[in-house]
Amino acid sequence: MNNAPHLYFAWQQLVEKSQLMLRLATEEQWDELIASEMAYVNAVQEIAHLTEEVAPSTTMQEQLRPMLHLILDNESKVKQLLQIRMDELAKLVGQSSVQKSVLSAYGDQGGFVLAPQDNLF
């Protein structure tokens, strides 16, 4: 069975999904990026299945190589953008923890506002 056209089409679909994910990450549309991840994983699994059935010819491999490079480049860029986002979130969580500690330490003053007094003597 010659599945070369179907395999090539599957790779084209994967490239499109990869480009979509890069665009979403670049635009910081994190919810949409996460939602699109399953379609990407399914496309990768389909390619793996097609490749298991019949190994692509050398000619087909040469045709697919540029697509693979593009997909890998996109994936690397998405990972970099995700790491930047994770660092931002970690910073926000750290700030939130500090605020919680401050509120915990100084929030139990019984409703009294502690302020310096002018008349100490």
From Swiss-Prot:
Q: Where is this chain primarily localised?
A: cytoplasm
Gene3D superfamilies per the UniProt record, alphabetical: Flagellar protein flit
Please list where the region (Required for homodimerization) is annotated.
1-50
Q: Source organism lineage?
A: Bacteria, Pseudomonadati, Pseudomonadota, Gammaproteobacteria, Enterobacterales
The similarity comment for this entry is: Belongs to the FliT family.
Q: Does the keyword Zinc-finger apply?
A: no
SUBUNIT field: Homodimer. Interacts with FliD and FlhC.
What keywords are annotated for this sequence in UniProt?
A: Bacterial flagellum biogenesis, Chaperone, Cytoplasm, Repressor, Transcription, Transcription regulation
- Please indicate which superkingdom the organism of origin belongs to: Bacteria
Instruction: Give the encoding gene's name.
Output: fliT
Per the record, which residues fall in region FliD binding? 60-98
User: What is the purpose of this protein?
Assistant: Dual-function protein that regulates the transcription of class 2 flagellar operons and that also acts as an export chaperone for the filament-capping protein FliD. As a transcriptional regulator, acts as an anti-FlhDC factor; it directly binds FlhC, thus inhibiting the binding of the FlhC/FlhD complex to class 2 promoters, resulting in decreased expression of class 2 flagellar operons. As a chaperone, effects FliD transition to the membrane by preventing its premature polymerization, and by directing it to the export apparatus.
Please cite one Gene Ontology biological process associated with this protein.
protein folding
Return the protein name: Flagellar protein FliT
Can you name the source organism? Escherichia coli O1:K1 / APEC
Q: Where in the cell is it found?
A: Cytoplasm, Cytosol
Give the CC-aspect GO terms.
Answer: cytosol
| Keyword ATP-binding attached | no
Q: Which Pfam families match?
A: FliT
